[in-house]
A protein has these predicted regions:
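Residues at helix-coil transition
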Residues: 20-21, 30, 62, 128-133
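Hydrophobic ligand-binding cavity/cleft-lining segments
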Residues: 1-34
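Glycine-centered loop/turn positions within well-structured domains
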Residues: 13, 64, 126
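Aromatic-glycine hotspot motif
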Residues: 1-9, 90-97, 143
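Hydrophobic-ligand binding "helix-grip"
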Residues: 34, 44-93, 97, 101-104
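Signature tryptophan residues that serve as conserved aromatic anchors
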Residues: 16, 28, 70-71, 115-116, ...
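A conserved amphipathic terminal alpha-helix motif
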Residues: 102-143
Length: 143
């Protein structure tokens, strides 16, 4: 399993929007996502390298957690499960925990490869920059 945890200086609701609004996800993920954020909802991801992933939303509680399964569109045997957990962390801050685990043996290699992916190692910086561009105009006193 790959796990990344970061505390960001944003309210839970703003972090949730940054994780789930397709336009903002495109900024920090680098690809495009289309999804139905309901239990059992379908998703499709176009990755920055041109690859495609399909998936299904397993469970979602707005502002708290999102769990989905996804796989390369051309390899349905490489399924992994991704979970986002958002928690308040003091005044004006939120903790984000992102976990990805393989669900079938073939996915283990892909998940291990993702551990070194720049999107994981820089998630905190990239997500914060995406949040800042999107929400700076809404936040009084944010510079």
């Amino acid at each position: 399993m790959v796990e990344r945890e970061v505390v960001l200086p944003v309210e839970v609701g703003e972090l949730w929007e940054a994780l789930t609004e397709p336009e903002v996800v495109a900024e920090w993920f680098g690809g495009e996502v289309e999804w139905d954020l309901t239990d059992g909802g379908r998703m499709h991801v176009r990755e920055p390298d041109g690859g495609h992933r399909d998936g299904v939303v397993e469970s979602v509680t707005a502002g708290e957690h999102l769990r989905f399964r996804w796989w390369p569109s051309d390899d349905v045997t490489s399924v992994s499960e991704v979970t986002y957990v958002v928690q308040p962390e003091g005044a004006g801050s939120s903790r984000l925990t992102v976990m990805e685990r393989p669900l079938v043996p073939g996915a283990a290699t892909a998940v291990r490869a993702c551990a070194g992916d720049h999107r994981w190692s820089a998630l905190d910086d990239v997500l914060f920059r995406a949040w800042a561009r999107t929400y700076a105009s809404r936040s009084v006193g944010f510079a």
